[in-house]
Amino acid sequence: MCKRRKNPYKGLSNFVGGKIEENENGLDAAYRELEEETTISRNDIILSHLMDFTYHLGNCYLEVYVGKLNRAINVSGDENELYWTTLDNDFFDVTKYAGEGNIGHIMMHVKMYQEELLK
């Protein structure tokens, strides 16, 4: 997770991520953003596509990927403060987590399908 240093959601915890670049698919963008923001590379993790969100009024499409590390890693990044967390936090707490409850919704599905997703 990252603690955002800028708006939106300054001071709140969020997932790392970013925009899909031209001629790039969502999975490649997820790996690229993960490495840029945390130093976690394709060699360290296999990502799986979990879900998508479409915000029609904001013309925004969000792809969500999840993965399990294949080794212990110390994350580092310049953009935001990074930290590891456990799956048992209250990710619906909007005083701690960005996204108006979306992180809670996403993490609820990660927990529901963790045996399949995080094998």
Annotate the PLM regions:
Residues 8, 22, 73:
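Flexible, glycine-rich phosphate/dinucleotide-binding loops
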Residues 8-12, 76-119:
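Nudix hydrolase/Nudix homology domain
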Residues 39-73:
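Active-site segment of metal-dependent pyrophosphate-handling enzymes
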Residues 1-14, 42, 68:
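N-terminal strand-loop-strand
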Residues 15-49:
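The catalytic Nudix box helix
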Residues 5, 19, 51-54:
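Structured beta->alpha junctions
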Residues 5, 68-72, 87-89:
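Short loop segments at secondary-structure junctions
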Residues 1, 64-66, 84:
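Conserved hydrophobic/aromatic beta-strand scaffold that supports enzyme active sites
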